């Protein structure tokens, strides 16, 4: 798991619970999308998008 995603999940219990409910394949896709980003701002955007989705905001 990317460090930025792990930190964001640790800081947000609702998103962390959403992460735990996800199937392994979905978790892997979120992690891959973040890891594959070349620019730091892209990684940050993808982490924010994943957290919002896990919170049920998108």
Where are these regions (language model features)?
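Charge-dense, helix-prone N-terminal extensions
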Residues: 1-58
